[in-house]
Amino acid sequence: MLLLELKKTNQTLETIHFIGIGGVGMSGIAEILYNLGYKVQGSDLVENYNTKRLESYGIKIFLGHAEQNITNVSYVVISSAINPKNPEIKEALERKIPIIRRADMLAELMRLKCSVAVSGSHGKTTTTSLVACLFEAAGLCPTVINGGIINNKSTNAYLGSSNYLIAEADESDATFIHIPSTIAIITNIDPEHLDYYRDFETLIGAFRSFITNLPFYGFAVCCIDHKIVRKLVDDITERKIVTYGIDSEDAHIIAFNINTDIASSTFDVKISLPNVLGTTIIEKITIPTPGRHNILNSLAAIAVGIELDFGIKAIKNGFNNFKGVKRRFTKVAEYNNASIIDDYAHHPEEIKATLATAKNIANKQNGKVIAIFQPHRYSRMQYLFDDFMLCFADADILYITDIYAAGENPIEGITGRSLVDKITKRKHHDKANFLAELDDAVGVIIDNAASGDMIIMMGAGNISSFANELEGRLSSRGFSCHTVV
């Protein structure tokens, strides 16, 4: 980065090209580099929210991948999601243009900063956003690179003026262990990305390295309600670790007196830090998002704020300023006095957390939970098939579509219909249905929605676009639907 800075100063700007620039991780880094003054461009297969946003800043976006897209570039940035046979990669190799992995570019941005890296199987994006809100409330102005759109900012990345950088650290391909972080957060560890790691123990080992690679003056923040994380923490003695939880009485930071509704969660916090005498109680902390899992995410942010002496007022103000993250239990519409929720949940543990939150709210409203789930990736379904069969218990009515491939080839016997058949055969759910076409979900909503119901549309594929288009789809059939802005 220092060499690039020198070239920038000397007015000899070189172009950095991002393949797959519309991806949430890639778009964030591209935006930060652009705001730092670098010349940035990129390509993606289709236009989306991220490409439109970047284009509005003046960043050149190519739709489609082609050799000519990198005619005048000096560096190419890729993520692990990019196929090695991509024509732009092949052209870069042919012309010996340096190809930089997304994680390596993120590491360069973090290298000269005091950095907070947030990792874990679930909750990374929300936790990153919450930490950022506390930094801002404390009078610091961090640079933030997130894995989702932060509603406060309408972007997933923004440049700050301080020496702090807060980033979501993607564990999918083990590159997160090379990120030069000062503070590391681990929200949880579940079997995920086993197509890369091959076995769970290797994945756990990567998280261990994530902690032990911290400098001696840094610290980790870990959720020990999760048994795998607890075991990991118990085995590490060479780094400072601050723990948090709801059920773990020995955690350093514990939430209690919990109340939650459709829009928020309120709780008290007990703080008993290592090597600090006495206990501190913070009463009535409120976060404007529901769910036990989000309370845990907020505890991670509190741990960072307490360790960095932000003060209780800044912590409370930071949470008050938090407006949520796009696609994390986002209410997008109302139909027949039922709430329609768009959620990114695509792993069994995420699904359980989302449906548990919905069930809690529906019970208070004398309603039911209607879950419409679009599976994501054949490989994930194959590795976690048994877990998927068991994760829908809190749905009163369940509909499962076919699998959103995300570029993968089909795997024999692994389909949305086969999942429904197994759930029904083994009596894990008595109202599980296969939805042949996502468009059929409109009829499901018309036929089933009643006052107080929670309609949860989940998945990492195109179900989000569908959920956000429901007003038009329902009105075209003569039904009134109120979109929530």
UniProtKB/Swiss-Prot annotation:
It is found in: Cytoplasm. It is an enzyme of class 6 (ligase). Belongs to the MurCDEF family. It holds the Pfam family Mur_ligase. The gene is murC. Cell wall formation. Gene3D superfamilies: Mur ligase, C-terminal domain, Mur-like, catalytic domain, NAD(P)-binding Rossmann-like Domain. One of its GO terms (cellular component) is cytoplasm. InterPro entries: Mur-like_cat_sf (IPR036565), Mur_ligase_C (IPR004101), Mur_ligase_C_dom_sf (IPR036615), Mur_ligase_cen (IPR013221), Mur_ligase_N (IPR000713), MurCDEF_pg_biosynth (IPR050061), UDP-N-AcMur_Ala_ligase_MurC (IPR005758). GO terms for biological process: cell division; cell wall organization; peptidoglycan biosynthetic process; regulation of cell shape. Its EC number is 6.3.2.8. ATP binds at G120, S121, H122, G123, K124, T125, T126. One of its GO terms (molecular function) is ATP binding. Keywords: ATP-binding, Cell cycle, Cell division, Cell shape, Cell wall biogenesis/degradation, Cytoplasm, Ligase, Nucleotide-binding, Peptidoglycan synthesis. It catalyses: UDP-N-acetyl-alpha-D-muramate + L-alanine + ATP = UDP-N-acetyl-alpha-D-muramoyl-L-alanine + ADP + phosphate + H(+). Pathway: Cell wall biogenesis; peptidoglycan biosynthesis. This is UDP-N-acetylmuramate--L-alanine ligase.
